[in-house]
Amino acid sequence: MRVVIQRVKASRVEVDGEVIGTIGRGLNLLVGISRTDTIAEVEWMVRKCLDLRLFPDEKGSLALSVQEMGAELLVVSQFTLYGDGRKGRRPSFDRAAGGEQAQTLYDRFVAGLRQSGLRVETGQFGAMMEVFILNDGPVTLLLEREAPLEQEDNRDD
C-alpha cells in the first residue's frame, strides 16, 4: 500500500465539474493499493496517517499530528501510484490491485480514518477526478507498506 501525504491549507476533488469532497487545513491522501495488500497494511497505514507529526507547534517544529490538530482529511484513490515506468514508454500497472479488491481495502482505509472522529472527505473511487491541492510548506511524504510476500526490508512500526 502506498499513500502520498500532503499537508494542505485546502484541497478539493471534482468529478465532471462537481465538487464531491473539500477540506480546509489538513492532509490530502493519495492512496494506491497493491494486489498483495491485506487488512494488515490498511490498519498500519491508518495509524501512520493519523499519528505522523506533520504540523508545526508554536516553535515551528513538526510536532503535531492531524489528530492533535483536529484537522481534516481528503482521501483520493490513485492506482497510478503502482505504475512502473522502467520498461518501454507506457507504464505497467501489474502491481496495482484489481478494482474489487482495491475498493474493498480503500473503503476499509477510509472507515479506519473516520473512526478517529476527524472530518474525512473522499473522491469517487474509479472515477476520473480533478484534485486541487493548496500545499502547506510544502510537506509531502510517501508512505509505503508492502505485504510480507513482497517485503524486502524489515518492517518499521
Curated annotation (Swiss-Prot):
Which UniProt keywords are listed? Cytoplasm, Hydrolase, RNA-binding, tRNA-binding
Q: What role is this protein assigned?
A: An aminoacyl-tRNA editing enzyme that deacylates mischarged D-aminoacyl-tRNAs. Also deacylates mischarged glycyl-tRNA(Ala), protecting cells against glycine mischarging by AlaRS. Acts via tRNA-based rather than protein-based catalysis; rejects L-amino acids rather than detecting D-amino acids in the active site. By recycling D-aminoacyl-tRNA to D-amino acids and free tRNA molecules, this enzyme counteracts the toxicity associated with the formation of D-aminoacyl-tRNA entities in vivo and helps enforce protein L-homochirality.
| Any GO CC annotation of this UniProt entry | cytoplasm
- Cite the EC number: 3.1.1.96
Q: How does it assemble?
A: Homodimer.
Q: What class of enzyme is it?
A: hydrolase
The family database entries (Gene3D superfamilies) matched by this protein are listed as: D-tyrosyl-tRNA(Tyr) deacylase (3.50.80.10)
Catalysed reaction per UniProt? Answer: glycyl-tRNA(Ala) + H2O = tRNA(Ala) + glycine + H(+); a D-aminoacyl-tRNA + H2O = a tRNA + a D-alpha-amino acid + H(+)
* Main subcellular location: cytoplasm
Record SUPFAM superfamilies: DTD-like
What species is given as this protein's source? Cyanothece sp. (strain PCC 7425 / ATCC 29141)
This protein is called D-aminoacyl-tRNA deacylase
Instruction: Cite the domain annotation text.
Output: A Gly-cisPro motif from one monomer fits into the active site of the other monomer to allow specific chiral rejection of L-amino acids.
Q: Which domain of life is it from?
A: Bacteria
Q: State the family named in the UniProt similarity comment for this chain.
A: Belongs to the DTD family.
